[in-house]
Amino acid sequence: MGIKVQRPRCFFDIAINNQPAGRVVFELFSDVCPKTCENFRCLCTGEKGTGKSTQKPLHYKSCLFHRVVKDFMVQGGDFSEGNGRGGESIYGGFFEDESFAVKHNKEFLLSMANRGKDTNGSQFFITTKPTPHLDGHHVVFGQVISGQEVVREIENQKTDAASKPFAEVRILSCGELIPKSKVKKEEKKRHKSSSSSSSSDSDSSSDSQSSSESSDSESASEEKSRKRKKKHRKNSRKHKKEKKKRKKSKKSPSSESEAENVDAQPQSTVRPEEIPPIPENRFLMRKSPPKADDKERKNRERERERECNPPNSQPASYQRRFLVTRSGRKIKGRGPRRYRTPSRSRSRDRFRRSETPPHWRQEMQRAQRMRVSSGERWIKGDKSELNEIKENQRSPVRVKEKKITDHRHMSESPNRKVEKEKKAKDHKSESKERDIRRNSEKDDKYNKNKVKKRGKSKSRSKSKERSKSKERDSKHSRHEDKRVRSRSKERDHETTKEKEKPLDPKGKDQERSRSKENSKQVESKSNEHDHSKSKEKDRRAQSRSRERDLTKSKHSYNSRTRERSRSRDRSRRVRSRSHDRDRSRSKEYHRYREQEYRRRGRSRSRDRRTPGRSRSKDRRRRRRDSRSSEREESQSRNKDKYRSQESKSSHRKENSEGEKRTYSKSRDHNSSSNNREKKADREQSPVSKTKQSSQDNEVKSSTLKNQEDEKTRSPVEKENQKSKGQENDHVHDKNKKCDHESSPGTDEDKSG
């Protein structure tokens, strides 16, 4: 008969959120797996000190239950980290699986948690339902004897996604339970030994008293004691047999009831697929080594893809992304297309030959739109036409400024105009490129500066003319004077013909080129004459005295005829210019009128909507019309006054010049010496005389013609002018009355 060994027991005192929840007592199956039970018992008592790898005490005290899965299990035992990644056995690190004899066939079993085969450490779990799917993977080494309700309370705690309970479930204290049955047996043995000694003492006293008796009684007592011992042994054997039978009889119904209970117990509703995996212990590993299963799966997937897609073909997902151009090329990659191949058909693609991308071409087109369109192509020397186009597009205020400048030009003499035109041509040639680049706003400033420069150039030209005339009079001879006169005639005829014709841009170019050539010829000839003068002075001095007497009469007659012809030509030019100006002014005035009528037509629709504003605008227009008419009348009066003054001054000049001529003729006849004649020739050269006489004749002819025009004006025109002036005055008075009678308007009306 083998003696039955009692299994070791351990306990946990558990607290939830630092509040004691109760004690759980475990019975360890030391007979089935002694090594695992010894590991658990030592961790409960903490008798093994610190761990080799973790360097922490090998003790479950103050350890957490870090993983709780309802209807499955409650896990703990990670004393190093407290999250399921730590722990260590008393043997150092991990130890092997000992036995899978006991199955997970009931609830409240104590089993070892691991990370795979032979990876048992300090972590354990208590099942709350039968879990047969864990058989063969985890070693069962104990069961819960008492404290099942505490385990249920831990199971019912709320958890997060990682199955960690929100409440802190901690082991306050733990240890081993020693059974009391051993102490009782020892006490019983001691009690039996004491009773047997007392009985032996009593027997010895009785023997001493009866020593006197006979030896027969002694032998009889010995036999009786032997019989008693035999009987006692027999009885003890019988009792033992009976006890064994009773125990067997008790065990058989209990085993049947246990089997029935196992069948009646509900199995776990949790599937093994739903159980979350146990976190791996990676410790200091930066990258975990790839598993063999994962490698095999990847290899299988690659083989399937190769079988489905041959080496030349591409996957379907990428084939959808590829775009094909017109030429048949596949476009790979992401993002918008920046370049494309040219189409083979010319009709399809407009920009077949251009290599610039479309987005670049769009930017170029936008930049071209921003450039100012200059209209017609600019020809060399056409600055005046461009200025006229720009001035026509401007407001009527600028037209009035033009009229004032035109009046100033009228008052100037024709000789000065010719000289100004020559200078203006040089100035125009220099400033052609500048004027093209400038805008319309800069053109206004340029015109104003031009008017100022003309005034300055007049004074300079006068001083230059005087100095040149003196030098030429002293140097040039009569033969040179004749040549100069003939050239001047030809130029005058050419200028009159060209001015009578309508001016074209090509004609202007020809005029400018001719004037430049003439000026160059005159300069070259003057230089030649200066060189030859010094040689010919002696010869000419002798011939002058002889020829003067003969040529005086001829020269006087010829000069008169020339002066008359020149005066006629110039009067014609003046008339043509005045007519042209009047026409241009009338055209500009008609344009201005048409613009005003258009504005009035547009404003009528607005006036219907807003009658108050239309009245104020009508008043402003009337005032402007009246002011413009008054200005025109004042300008015409100033013209008449200026012409009359010019005629008077010309008459006075003629009288004074006639007196001077008679006086000089008498002096010339009376003088006998040649020296006086030479001095008179130096003081007054024939060129200067001809210029003065020509100027006088021109002024006379212009004044006479102006007087004739004024006389020939019909009385009907005068009456029309008077009636127009009366109407304007009448309108002006009405406007004033309306302004006085009307209510106080806005700031705009007052300013208008």
Curated annotation (Swiss-Prot):
Task: Tell me where in this chain the PPIase cyclophilin-type domain is found.
Answer: 11-176
Q: Name one GO biological process term.
A: protein folding
Q: Which residues carry this modification: Phosphoserine?
A: 252, 254-255, 257, 288, 313, 354, 384, 395, 411, 413, 685, 688, 694, 742-743, 751
Q: What is its EC number?
A: 5.2.1.8
Q: Under the GO molecular function aspect, what terms does this record hold? A: peptidyl-prolyl cis-trans isomerase activity
- Enumerate the residue ranges of region (Disordered): 182-752
Q: Which InterPro entries match?
A: Cyclophilin-like_dom_sf, Cyclophilin-type_PPIase_CS, Cyclophilin-type_PPIase_dom
What superkingdom heads the lineage? Eukaryota
Which reactions appear under catalytic activity for this entry? [protein]-peptidylproline (omega=180) = [protein]-peptidylproline (omega=0)
Q: Where is the composition biased (Polar residues)?
A: 685-705
Which cell locations does it reside in? Answer: Nucleus matrix; Nucleus speckle
Q: Which UniProt keywords apply?
A: Isomerase, Isopeptide bond, Nucleus, Phosphoprotein, Rotamase, Ubl conjugation
- Report the Gene3D superfamilies cross-referenced here: Cyclophilin-like
| Compositional bias annotation for Low complexity | 194-214
- Residue numbers carrying Phosphothreonine: 356, 746
What are the Basic and acidic residues biased-composition ranges?
290-308, 346-366, 377-447, 462-552, 577-598, 626-684, 706-752
Q: Where is the composition biased (Basic residues)?
A: 182-193, 226-251, 327-345, 448-461, 599-625
PROSITE patterns named in the record: CSA_PPIASE_1 (PS00170), CSA_PPIASE_2 (PS50072)
**Assigned GO CC terms:** cytosol; nuclear matrix; nuclear speck
How the protein is activated or inhibited is described as: Inhibited by cyclosporin A (CsA).
| UniProt cross-link Glycyl lysine isopeptide (Lys-Gly) (interchain with G-Cter in SUMO2), position | 390, 691
Query: What subunit structure does UniProt give?
Result: Interacts with CLK1, PNN and with the phosphorylated C-terminal domain of RNA polymerase II.
* Function (record text): PPIase that catalyzes the cis-trans isomerization of proline imidic peptide bonds in oligopeptides and may therefore assist protein folding. May be implicated in the folding, transport, and assembly of proteins. May play an important role in the regulation of pre-mRNA splicing.
The record's note on its domains: The RS domain is required for the interaction with the phosphorylated C-terminal domain of RNA polymerase II.
- Protein name, per record: Peptidyl-prolyl cis-trans isomerase G
Q: Whose protein is this, by species?
A: Mus musculus (Mouse)
Traced from the root, the source organism's taxonomic lineage reads:
Eukaryota, Metazoa, Chordata, Craniata, Vertebrata
Which gene is this protein's source? Answer: Ppig
